[in-house]
Design a protein with these regions (language model features):
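Short, highly charged low-complexity linear segments
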Residues: 73-81, 100-101, 134-137, 148-158, ...
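Glycine- and small-hydrophobic-enriched helix-loop-helix hairpins
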Residues: 46, 51-126
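Juxtamembrane/interface alpha-helical elements of multi-pass membrane proteins
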Residues: 3, 7-81
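Short alpha-helix boundary/capping motifs
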Residues: 25, 64, 71-75, 86, ...
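Solvent-exposed, charged/polar functional surfaces in cytosolic regulatory/catalytic domains
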Residues: 42, 98, 138, 142
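Membrane-interface, cytosolic juxtamembrane amphipathic helix immediately N-terminal to a transmembrane helix
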Residues: 28, 119-162
């Protein structure tokens, strides 16, 4: 009887923790998109001064930022610094996997960042600032979607997985 009670408690507890983990993934994605918007605003300000190269901007952002994007921007800066890697597109192709692995960003957000960085350095400063502004606006739309996802999907999965755990306990015992 005690083993049954312990198993029931374990199943309900683990199902609750799984639901909580899914909910926190939605919250983390929302937070990471907001961090990315903040980083892009810093890049836009640095570009507007016109005194920094992309390498220096990426290095500064990588140094300032302690979020998941720090490694990506430091790696981009290092790639631009060393001559043997290649063009910006090749460096970006090598490093975009960092965003896919280390963040909860969806492919559409990663594509936004990919397109933006690929176009940086290929035009004048005003065009680059407009591209950054456009990317920020698109990401702000994604933040409203992620906020809805938190309240709808995140809470739904949290409750659903807990009730599935309770249901499994009822069926098994």
């Amino acid at each position: 009887l005690q083993i049954k009670i312990m198993l029931i408690g374990f199943l309900i507890g683990s199902s609750y923790l799984i639901g909580e983990y899914i909910y926190k993934m939605y919250v983390s994605r929302h937070r990471q998109i907001n961090d990315l918007i903040r980083i892009l605003e810093i890049i836009r300000m640095d570009l507007s001064f016109g005194m920094y190269t992309l390498e220096e901007i990426f290095d500064r952002v990588g140094d300032k930022d302690s979020s998941v994007y720090s490694r990506f921007f430091k790696s981009m800066s290092y790639g631009l610094k060393s001559d043997d890697i290649g063009t910006l597109d090749e460096i970006l192709t090598c490093n975009i996997g960092i965003l896919n692995k280390d963040t909860y960003l969806a492919s559409k957000e990663v594509d936004e960042v990919n397109k933006l960085i690929a176009t940086l350095g290929k035009s004048d400063v005003e065009s680059q600032q407009r591209m950054i502004d456009l990317t920020i606006e698109n990401l702000k739309k994604h933040t409203s979607e992620t906020k809805e996802d938190i309240t709808k999907k995140g809470m739904l999965y949290k409750k659903l997985v807990t009730f599935v755990g309770i249901g499994v306990c009822i069926v098994l015992f």
